[in-house]
């Protein structure tokens, strides 16, 4: 579609700069001509007014940085981006690794590489990801132990080879589908009619050093292949084009991890409950050094776990694009994009569980204290040394089929139609389910000491007399769990867009859209709590087990070889051990995942929207560009959940009533919301090289899938005063953000600029929790309409015969003693205290039970703001250049208070970040080093056991390098290194000594070539 024009003198200057750098590269061609084939695809991009140059073609590091600079310079609002040569020239495992070089963008890593992005302190769930202007679905099941309810797109599924550019829209506009509060990220792929014909192929050898830092049984191949290819051709006088891209990568790697995965239990210093350390003056208090004060907060570890993990991944990407221009003013595009990411993970562990018995401990100072030494006394030495193992296998599959028609009706009017159907699916890829865990133990553990004085915790285990180390002859299977996790998200979207030109510098953009999103998460599991063991150790062949030492796999951490470290553990053959446990129990079904789901959440969102946006340029001495628009969006939510169906209430103990459950069934809830979302962008060209920019917009971020799930889940135990349960709320409002941006940009030299930007987001409707009290009555309803004997006819008879209202023992004795055999009453005997035993069921004539239902609710409003600093400079013709940025993000009222117990609202992902890129490109050589840094940030507000506790990711910096050489016009070679300084990742709790996870990954190196035919 036609582009909004800017002042001619700026266009001519920019064109002159870029034309001086132009060299052929198929992916970078951009144009402002009215050629039909090019107009046909511009409507598929979000930024319809960013490119104002005449046929500019760039290549290399310098050229690609210049293209990124001019994307920023010529855009409406605040936009940053990366072009394909920039991505292709850099050692990026995926797009997330590339995006982190943009100011304000930080990444969350999974399995050693970028997975999800945070923009300006706004987490992955609230950043919209699109492919060629189309909203993309997302799916994941995390580590296989459960389903994901996140909307966040996983960039690890996509290779970077086929991408022409990535655009990050930090300010919104009316034409962008809503959903991105932090940013909207648009991934653009190659189009044959706007690209020079090309055929090339590339191959790489990948060596991940972490693979060699694993036990032999967990290792993959030291060298794995990666291959990619591009075919793009035009036919029939340039009216028909075909582009085919594909890539395949195998990666074998590993990581070693130590931590407290089941979390830390927090207490006040004056508490005296299970898990607390002894109070002053009580038995055991003499074993405490520097005891936390009565108002201090302290935490004790639930366990300590070491693991070695071998991972194999096979990633396949492909895209086929067909374009046809049947007339000079019509272009049609049909494209299909496919990605498959298969992941297999094997894990072996050494762990100890703390039962909070007698202990010896020493502590840091308060007010938030952590143990330096925590020793649990176990005598005799017959507790378990746990050495479990896991096998995980999942496949992530993404498909997208799209069709686009662009019609230039006249010089003043363009229209386009775009439709796509896309899906993202994550499913098990093993006959044993998405993840299977076998507990294996040796019951030889005595006094157990955990030393948390260093980043690497060290465990010391006292073994029984005559036992010097763990042996295969002591090992047997204990507990187990096999999971079946499934997630699928589908999007069907139709967009109609148009632009009417009023004159040389003014126009009206308009459009409408319909989007149907269906998301399903389902989960089932088979768990055996046989923690005392399955059979005896003598029932297992010693050849199943292989002794090893855990410390040698943590060489990047100080303390891994401490003499006090009891690091002996047993590896085992997972398949043989699983088969033996199934044989011993006679129940093979206990050791595989069930096919049926016990939890199944299905949600559909139907959104309709429309927008108008007016753009104009006042060509004064200082040209002023304005864009003002508004978008209307209405969303209807229907959510169904498979939940256990409660059928009745039985009073079986003095203060406890139990729910009776039948077959599970689907329950459905509905909701809707609508918003008018305005935007205003202004940019003032103070000089040909200086721009002052300001923007305002309102955006929304939709609630997570779990928050809007249908159906109510009731807890099995009901008290005399009522029951409890949980439910989602499809009528939840989205987060609403008023966004303000102001920036100064100075393009002071060729390929060089400096910019400073301030941003502020006033966000309302943050989601917390509240309780709904459902009280039964003659004309009311409660969950499942359950009748309780409390307050019923039998109950009232007991009160009438002298039982006090609060004496439930008296009431039960009276009912069971006087109404045995009557409807709902069955007496089974008398207990040791002389009280009647039996059950009293609720009758239809009894009152309806009341339930306190915990549900998500819009509860919090807050503000965050920050600064972005960018500098990019090329040092003349020397070949040297630098690009750097720094981002500051702050929100004082959204921080976590470590000295407060219980649930808190805090913004996760909020952190400063910085990037530095140094490069040299001349005489066929290109060398680049990049350092990416992210400050400490809060990643979660609950720990591994679901306890309200903060999770902080320590600050992290990574150094990468790329060296390329152009042999001739057809052949180039490249060497790449990622994390070459072998940085580690650490997560901790309320105190830095409360290690949650410390992970060693390792450097990765790649050597490859690319040949262009």
Predicted feature residues:
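N-terminal periplasmic "start-of-domain" segments of outer-membrane beta-barrel proteins
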Residues: 57-90, 116, 127, 139-147
